[in-house]
């Protein structure tokens, strides 16, 4: 029997949609995992590590070479310095890092601010910590989405302890601007908040967008836990190698929780990820270019079918509105889509939290949108577009 605070989160929509897609042979544009492998040298390094006996517990904070590689990568790309001995912690994916940060730094009864819509693990880990969620929605901005800084400022109360920020943003594909990040920094400093930043798509930004780590803004280095992962950077979502970077005092809190979640993980994958961080910048750049082209390919196909497609400047995802085709409820639309046309997608309402006050209203606002992933091979995207074209031939109304 599941405890009451976790009953709303018993099964994720991603697991449900992926299982349905597998069962009926649908093209899975719902869950964000690529169908191509990462850098060959990284894959070989993992095989070599296994063959070489790197199969027992690694050090609790992560292997020293990986922590050094993470710190060097942050410095090289973003100009942010971390001591690999005390300010870098290797985790079992970014999801564990997020959970450990909340569990290790947020007291029961305090409030955590979430920007809605949000990745589905945020809300349950806040519940696990015994804290309260307070949501602040993104707002439409032309063909994209933007932060309402005034709404964020109003949401802060004396009980607010932490703020979780995700940019590049899953599910919308928005990338927070320097102006938006500066506003977040000003609010966080004024209210003395801990900020947990989920930056797993930091290298997957397109067009004019630029990823700026919040830790680099004035007053933020001492209060920010920056979380990232090898999964999206190197097409290895199943390896579950993530990390958290931040001031030693905060990282100690994250580690205190993390050590009782998984203790350690992925011993033979850690040297492989270290190698990739040190040597595969060109591979990541090629991945970014490929994803930009695939985003354009999927967006063009959806537009031709009749969807209204929103701009995506980062991540694996874009949002589309099926109302021009006669579908007003994306939850119902996505539930029927696999069997109707053989494609799986995720309703935007899955990223909203109806248990968190005003979020129940926001679920209605977002429920006309659908999230599709474009991190698939061209032939996979083309087949999905071919199947979805049935909707243009037989619209709902």
Curated annotation (Swiss-Prot):
Sequence similarity: Belongs to the class-III pyridoxal-phosphate-dependent aminotransferase family.
GO biological process entries: lysine biosynthetic process via diaminopimelate
Catalytic activity: N-succinyl-(2S,6S)-2,6-diaminopimelate + 2-oxoglutarate = (S)-2-succinylamino-6-oxoheptanedioate + L-glutamate
Subcellular location: Cytoplasm
Pathway where this protein functions: Amino-acid biosynthesis; L-lysine biosynthesis via DAP pathway; LL-2,6-diaminopimelate from (S)-tetrahydrodipicolinate (succinylase route): step 2/3
Gene Ontology CC entries for this record: cytoplasm; peptidoglycan-based cell wall
Gene that this polypeptide is encoded by: dapC
A molecular function (GO) term: pyridoxal phosphate binding
Listed Gene3D superfamilies: Aspartate Aminotransferase, domain 1, Type I PLP-dependent aspartate aminotransferase-like (Major domain)
Subunit description: Homodimer.
Cofactor, free-text remark: Binds 1 pyridoxal phosphate per subunit.
Function: Involved in the lysine biosynthetic pathways. It catalyzes the transfer of an amino group from L-glutamate to N-succinyl-2-l-amino-6-oxoheptanedioate (N-succinyl-2-l-amino-6-ketopimelate) in a PLP-dependent reaction, yielding as products N-succinyl-l-2,6-diaminoheptanedioate (N-succinyl-diaminopimelate) and 2-oxoglutarate.
Annotated keywords: Amino-acid biosynthesis, Aminotransferase, Cytoplasm, Lysine biosynthesis, Pyridoxal phosphate, Transferase
Entry EC no(s): 2.6.1.17
N6-(pyridoxal phosphate)lysine: residues bearing it: 232
Name listed for the protein in its UniProt record: Probable N-succinyldiaminopimelate aminotransferase DapC
Enzyme class: transferase
Binding site for pyridoxal 5'-phosphate: 109-110, 218-222
Cited NCBIfam families: PRK07777.1
Cofactor(s) the protein needs: pyridoxal 5'-phosphate
């Amino acid at each position: 029997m599941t405890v009451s605070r976790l009953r709303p989160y018993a099964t994720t929509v991603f697991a449900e949609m992926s299982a349905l897609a597998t069962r009926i042979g649908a093209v899975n544009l719902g869950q964000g995992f690529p169908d191509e492998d990462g850098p060959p040298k990284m894959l070989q390094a993992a095989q070599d590590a296994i063959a070489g006996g790197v199969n027992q517990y690694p050090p609790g904070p992560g292997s020293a070479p990986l922590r050094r590689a993470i710190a060097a990568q942050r410095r090289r790309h973003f100009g942010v310095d971390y001591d690999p001995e005390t300010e870098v912690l290797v985790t079992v994916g970014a999801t564990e890092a997020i959970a450990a940060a909340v569990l290790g730094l947020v007291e029961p009864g305090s409030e955590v601010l979430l920007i809605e819509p949000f990745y589905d693990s945020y809300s349950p880990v806040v519940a696990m910590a015994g804290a309260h969620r307070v949501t602040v929605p993104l707002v439409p901005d032309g063909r994209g989405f933007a932060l309402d800084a005034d709404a964020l400022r109003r949401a802060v109360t004396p009980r607010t302890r932490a703020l979780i920020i995700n940019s590049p943003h899953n599910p919308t594909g928005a990338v927070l601007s320097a102006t938006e990040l500066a506003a977040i920094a000003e609010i966080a400093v004024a209210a003395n908040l801990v900020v947990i930043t989920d930056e797993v798509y930091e290298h997957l930004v397109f067009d004019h967008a630029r990823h700026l780590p919040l830790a680099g803004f004035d007053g933020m280095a001492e209060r920010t836990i920056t979380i990232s992962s090898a999964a999206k950077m190197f097409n290895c979502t199943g390896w579950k190698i993530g990390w958290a970077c931040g001031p030693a005092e905060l990282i100690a809190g994250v580690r205190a929780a993390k050590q009782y979640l998984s203790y350690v993980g992925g011993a033979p994958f850690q040297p492989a990820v270290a190698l990739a961080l040190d040597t595969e910048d060109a591979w990541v750049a090629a991945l970014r270019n490929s994803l930009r082209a695939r985003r354009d390919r999927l967006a063009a196909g959806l537009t031709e079918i009749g969807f209204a497609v929103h701009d995506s400047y980062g991540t694996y995802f874009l949002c589309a509105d099926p109302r021009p085709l006669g579908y007003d409820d994306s939850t119902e639309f996505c539930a029927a889509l696999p069997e109707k046309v053989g494609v799986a997608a995720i309703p935007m309402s899955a990223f909203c939290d109806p248990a968190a006050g005003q979020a129940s209203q926001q679920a209605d606002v977002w429920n006309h949108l659908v999230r599709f992933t474009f991190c698939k091979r061209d032939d996979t995207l083309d087949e999905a577009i071919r199947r979805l074209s049935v909707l243009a031939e037989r619209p709902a109304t």
